[in-house]
Structures are given as C-alpha cells and as structure tokens.
C-alpha cells in the first residue's frame, strides 16, 4: 500500500513479540507517521512490554509470549532502558481506540453497551472473539479489530464487526483493508 499525507492509516497493535524484527517494525511505523496520518492502537503485547520496561512488572509472561524475540531485535544487553527514546515515545502515543466516520477501531474487542471512552482496557486489548463475539456497538458504527487470528487467512466480516487478523504471526497473511472501497491487501 502507498498511503498519502491525506490518508489515515490505523494499525491495530501487536507490533512487538510477533517476529524477529520488532525494532524494524517500530522504525517503519514511526516513518509512516511522518508520511501519513498514522493512528497506532495499543495491543496486549505492547501493554506487556511497557509494564516490564516502565513499571518493572514481572517479566515471565511477556517473555513466554514473544518478549524474547523483541529483546533480541533490540540487542538487549540486560538493562530495561533498551528502547530508543523515539520508540518509547511511539509506544506512549498508542491509544486504546480510534473513531472515524462509520467505523471504530480497537485492538481486540469491545463491550457493546458501553461508550468507547468508558471501555475497560482489558476488553479493548485482551478479549478474544473465540470466547464471545460482541453484539453491535451502541454507537451504530462498525468495529474493526485484530487480536483474534483467522487461521484460514480470510477477513471475518460480520457486518457490525470486521476482524482483519489473518494469522500473520502463525504463517498466514498481514492484511490491510481500505474500508470505504473494500480493497484488501495481503502479504505473507
């Protein structure tokens, strides 16, 4: 895809822990922020990493879920200040949801009867659609989410909810969709 300065590019999170080059992914997202209107959402993997880096939280869960790959990509040498300042600023700029006309975006899911600005972070970052697919949101907008992998490589479109996680981390596709035209891009 080739977004222009007038385009809004919303990325749904899990930029770290999902492959061998988390650092390169963050560099590219920072670069995109200078080329287009980029809105980055906070995923559960960014949350786990920031809890360790900023709050010295226990690190075992993060390391079990891809943190080792992230540390390797940053050539971790034992100090929790391994993130370059520009990367830490990027992570601190991530939001839990974003709204556009007709759509809203979260990393994982939402509670259908609660306004977006009152949603629990756990719901927005951690809830799996495998556990429960939410009903339409009270805003009437279509939800666009990731987090729950569609292992068949297809976008899940339920009308009121679109899940674009097509299992990139597990060997599937990295997927982008232009919501107004419906055009889809996928790379492996």
Predicted feature descriptions by range:
Residues 5, 90, 97, 105, ...:
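Conserved hydrophobic/aromatic beta-strand scaffold that supports enzyme active sites
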Residues 14, 29, 43-44, 70, ...:
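Divalent metal-coordination and catalytic microenvironments
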Residues 8-13, 39-40, 103, 142-143, ...:
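Hydrophobic "anchor" residues on beta-strands that sit immediately upstream
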Residues 114-120:
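Cytochrome P450 core scaffold surrounding the K-helix E-X-X-R motif
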Residues 17, 46-47, 110, 150, ...:
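Short, glycine/acidic-enriched loop or turn micro-motifs at the edges of active sites
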Residues 120-187:
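Conserved beta-sheet core of the metallophosphoesterase superfamily
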Residues 101-110, 147-148:
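Short, well-ordered beta-to-alpha junction loops that form the rim of enzyme active sites
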Residues 5-6, 18-99, 125-134:
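Active-site neighborhood of divalent metal-dependent phosphoester bond hydrolases
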């Amino acid at each position: 895809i080739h977004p222009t300065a007038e385009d809004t590019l919303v990325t749904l999170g899990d930029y770290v822990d999902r492959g061998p080059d988390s650092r390169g992914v963050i560099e590219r997202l920072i670069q995109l922020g200078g080329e287009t209107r980029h809105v980055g959402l906070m995923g559960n993997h960014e949350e786990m990493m920031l809890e360790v880096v900023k709050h010295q939280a226990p690190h075992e869960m993060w390391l079990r879920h891809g943190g080792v790959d992230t540390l390797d990509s940053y050539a971790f040498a034992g100090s929790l200040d391994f993130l370059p300042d520009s990367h830490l600023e990027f992570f601190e700029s991530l939001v839990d949801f974003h709204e556009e006309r007709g759509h809203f975006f979260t990393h994982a899911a939402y509670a259908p009867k609660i306004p977006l600005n009152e949603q629990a972070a756990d719901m927005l970052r951690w809830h799996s659609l495998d556990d429960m697919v939410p009903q339409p949101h009270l805003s009437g907008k279509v939800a666009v989410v990731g987090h729950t992998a569609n292992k068949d490589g297809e976008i899940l479109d339920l009308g009121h909810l679109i899940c674009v996680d097509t299992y990139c981390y597990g060997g599937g596709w990295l997927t982008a969709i232009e919501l107004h035209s419906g055009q889809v891009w996928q790379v492996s």
